[in-house]
Amino acid sequence: MASGSGSSSSTSSSALSGRLPGSRSANPRKARILGLFDAIQDAVGPPKQAAADRRTVEKTWKLMDKVVRLCQNPKLQLKNSPPYILDILPDTYQHLRLILSKYDDNQKLAQLSENEYFKIYIDSLIKKSKRAMRLFKEGKERMYEEQSQERRNLTKLSLIFSHMLAEIKAIFPSGQFQGDNFRITKADAAEFWRKFFGERTIVPWKIFRQCLHEVHQISSGLEAMALKSTIDLTCNDYISVFEFDIFTRLFQPWGSILRNWNFLAVTHPGYMAFLTYDEVKARLQKYSLKPGSYIFRLSCTRLGQWAIGYVTADGNILQTIPHNKPLFQALIDGSREGFYLYPDGRSYNPDLTGLCEPTPHDHIKVTQEQYELYCEMGSTFQLCKICAENDKDVKIEPCGHLMCTSCLTSWQESDGQGCPFCRCEIKGMEPIIVDPFDPRDESRCFSFSDSLCTPMLDFDDDDLREECLIMNRLAALRKMNERQNSPVTSPGSSPLSQRRKTPPEPLQIPHLNLPPVPPRLDLIQKGLARSPCASPTGSPKSSPCMVRKQDKPLPAPPPLLREPPPPPERPPPIPPDSRTCRHLHHADNVPCRDQSTPHEAWCTRDLSGGNPASVCRVTHDGSPKLGVPSSSVLNGRHSRMSTEAGFMRHKHHKRRESPLETLRVYNGLSGNEEYDVPPRLSPPTITIHPIVKCPVLVNSVSDKVRNSAEEDDCEYKIPSSHPVSSRLPLHCHSIKHFPRLCENGQCLSNGTHNGISEIKKLKPPDQGDVIATSTVPIHFPPARTSARENHPHGSSLTRTPSDYDLLVPHPGEESFDISPPSQPPPPPPARTCVTEHVMPTALGSRPNSDVDLFLPHSDPCPEAPLPPARRGPGEVKSNRLSQEYDQLPSCPGKGQEKASNTKGELLLPNQNLIMRPT
């Protein structure tokens, strides 16, 4: 026990001496004696600590109070500059009271008193208080002399008390013990601590030295003693996780930490241990006539950072804290600029360029989910969210937030405290490289691998029997494996490299997962109101262009296995209650269902909607072109090829639907649709006349809204949802056309798919509804208002819209009373006409709507269909929202908006965490 106490006092005295033990000015004989004491202590081990109960803590308070009263003597004339012992000890007292208040009951207090770190801390605090009292007792009048050795020892004790206060606040934040959750700044150093010490908060120096020696070899006992005096900031023969974190930040990087420490702390003449701000100014005062003289020390107010004092050209003495770079890099840069030339006034300035090694940048891989999320906000993951101009290239430690170097430098130069996002203390910075998400490579491989590996396969048996599809998937899997094993890609140990690999070890998880970026509610709300791919600003310049998806050939389209029957000449009359809406078509625009589309006409399709930059359409000549997304009807089947979800049916559930667009149907299928091939039913048919002026009716139930950035300024066709009849004559009207999408000759109209959809009703042109007109001008007399437009709407039909409903009635129609097909009537005369008919009187539950909208004409026309029914107010609003969806203005300047929001966040007043005694 005596030997342990003697060793402790010897170590404390060596730490409080002017230079490091083992340095140039140390006495070799004294070093050998200290080495002998250190060997004895290693053999015996540190003494066991008594339980830190309430009585022991109160005893510590009394000792601290005595030290404060001794330091309040006016003869001392202590300067109120860090470290100011008259502030440090009262703050320590207040924090200990806070800790005891959190452990007030007996059970918690017993747990606190047995806490390993707390016992060692209280014991060390008692020893340091007794040592300060002994200084006053032994120094007597010399304590009042500012240049005496006793006064110098008191200043060093003040530094130790300052380190102990910072440590207890870090281990017991808010009075609660968090030592087992303390985050070490450097990832490699944190891995070392967890590997050897687990969740321990503090370990004896002997154990720490042995474990460190396994990773970084310690050459001699003198080097071990010097290393201990540098790491052990509280001088208690223990190394805490807090002290280890400070040491690794000071002498980074971890891979060469002992070499850096030897160059900077042992052999460098400019290093000063346990020196204060005032002492640096006093030491450099004698070199005021030698500009370029400098010394450096540990910052006592910002532990883990360096403070460099130097003499300027005009003889002033300044002190600075270098940011965003290691100390040796700051000294090299300062030497080149002429600031740091003479360490401690000496002419020899060590060359530190040997410490400069190319530090490998951590690669942060942008995942598909992050890519889609930031695209919805009109941004990219790699873009700095403060300036919205530069890419992120630096990571703040330990919180892990990313930004660009210029924003971080500006923030620190403006006296910003902590991280600009979370206000967490900035303990270090690491350069990083953000690898953007490339839809060409990653998503396609992942989609094929997921489609083969996931147990929830939902492919058609016909598709699985095709060799070409299976071979393409296997080739994509091999390519993905080669890319993951390639040295070009970022290493698996880099942060946020969330690849689809085996889960990382639990020890690496805190450093692999970066915290989320603070949400931008304004951008998220805008992103919900529109699709990222439909907006012209959905893909910024810094994001990978979606057009590149077409560079690589897609797998061959599935062959025609279930071909629907050929269409007859004319559509048979079907009761209107079981009929869906019809559109007008031209033969040169409609691709034949029996015609196979060439391989080049296949185009990728985004999961979240059509992207004008990533989809193609088949024009009148049949050639694929970029532009408005088409329905991609191939062989009577809808194209499901996607670069982001292969042939995976279950991926449809992951799409994000806008709250303003509740009418949207993805790929022509509702959310609960489970089939992929239309049922074999006898569909209504059409007769296509490319030259005839009178367009005929085509059955189409693509009543969904398609997103697009282009609008065709041409005349469109008038949809009709009723069969022809000979009861009313033909009328010709003149209506105003509205620009709207027309894909592959098919006019798109709005519809609902909430399980039960109301029959499409007519809406006046002035309400912004989608009106498709023929390419031939149609003239009508003015329509008069109908008294039946205020009638309640008719019964709705249960139907599920789908792209496969083209020329195919809904499967549910067979369960109702459908009239058998009649003989097709003779073709109508070759002239432009729009027909209508009267509703059957048998359907009393369905009121007639707007039959009087088209006036009788003298020219009779057999079999005229009813016009579409007028929409109700609720449907008018839905369609208006859907139409405005394609015409959303571009997002306002993201840079200004984000900068303003961030600025408003950054200007929060800093809280003063220092508690003063009352």
From Swiss-Prot:
GO terms for biological process: cell surface receptor signaling pathway; immune system process; negative regulation of epidermal growth factor receptor signaling pathway; protein ubiquitination; regulation of platelet-derived growth factor receptor-alpha signaling pathway; signal transduction. Gene3D superfamilies: Adaptor protein Cbl, N-terminal domain, EF-hand, SH2 domain, Zinc/RING finger domain, C3HC4 (zinc finger). Keywords: Calcium, Cytoplasm, Immunity, Metal-binding, Repeat, Transferase, Ubl conjugation pathway, Zinc, Zinc-finger. A zinc finger (RING-type) spans 384-423. PROSITE patterns: CBL_PTB, ZF_RING_1, ZF_RING_2. Residues 483-497, 898-918 have a biased composition (Polar residues). SUPFAM superfamilies: EF-hand, N-terminal domain of cbl (N-cbl), RING/U-box, SH2 domain. The keyword rRNA processing does not apply. This protein has one functional calcium-binding site. This is E3 ubiquitin-protein ligase CBL-B-A.
